[in-house]
Amino acid sequence: MTILISGSGIAGLTLGLTCHQLGFPFKIFESVEKIKPMGVGINIQPNAVRELFDLGFEYDLENIGIKTKEFGTFTKKGLKIWTEPRGKLAGYNWPQYSVHRGQLQMMLYNRLVNLAGKSCVCTGWKVRDFKDINSGISVEVVSENKKEKKFETGSVLIGADGIHSRVRKIIYPKEGKPIWNGAVLWRGTSESKPFRTGASMVMIGHASQRVVAYPITQTNKVSGKAIINWITELKFDPSKGWRKEDWSRKVNSSEFLPKFKDWKFDWIDIPELINNSEDIFEYPMVDRDPVKKWKKGKSLLIGDAAHPTYPVGS
């Protein structure tokens, strides 16, 4: 019987590809009408790269990202504290990659629909409710655009629908909203000359004010520049709350840039990186308390729906 999946983010698409590889029938429901590349940079650690290689993405990852060579921490004056190698250079059997999240998502989506057909991802439909039945699970899905609803039957329902998971909310109806820890992150990408090894990830500053930066593309041989992903972080009083737990809220740099105006070093210029960005996204650093189980009956959770975190180094 069919495996039903809620959400076509990184977890949902990877799960769909795994189902196809193993010969299990599946169907993904995605609330948006059209899947578009969203987000900024992320790091894919060697244990995750191993799974993507197994799905046949070894050459694709090389085309959309860059192998991370080094991680380093630095003071707010730009002085080195610690550096260490990453990926194969650190002894792993697989590399670490830095990529644009949107490029990663579209890589997964395009491969999936090429292998299994476009009908395997039902866009414009989202899970509203579900219940276990003798033959598996019955899932109610709705289309707000079409003003329709229908029922799908499968062997299991897997919630891959993120930190605001509808599946998780039904399993744990009293859980409430995600918890904010007082940190706010601003993220963006800009074209700039890469620093240090040319494939280094750096963390600059301290716990209440810091910057993370790393390239997410190969260096252009003509311009000598790469796309650099950057993250700035400031701490606030968590008791006062924040506007919204939303990583895609566009903002102006004036909300945080003054705090980093002097962070100009001989190897990286943080204000320049920020000012050269076309779009800047703001989101609070939120997660949820652990739950005892990621499964109830024939429904279960994966990804941020199961264990949501927003690590500043991602």
What role is predicted for each listed range?
Residues 2-3, 45-172, 176-189, 240-242, ...:
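Conserved N-terminal helical subregion
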Residues 5-32, 158-159, 186, 255-256, ...:
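Conserved mid-domain beta->alpha element of the FAD-binding
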Residues 35-36, 166-167, 309-310:
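Catalytic P-loop NTPase motifs of RecA-like helicase/translocase cores
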Residues 82-105, 142-152, 191-279:
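Conserved FAD/dinucleotide-binding core of flavoprotein oxidoreductases
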Residues 123, 135, 207-209, 281:
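Short beta-strand or tight-loop elements
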Residues 165, 185-187, 209-212, 306-307:
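Histidine-centered metal-chelating micro-motifs
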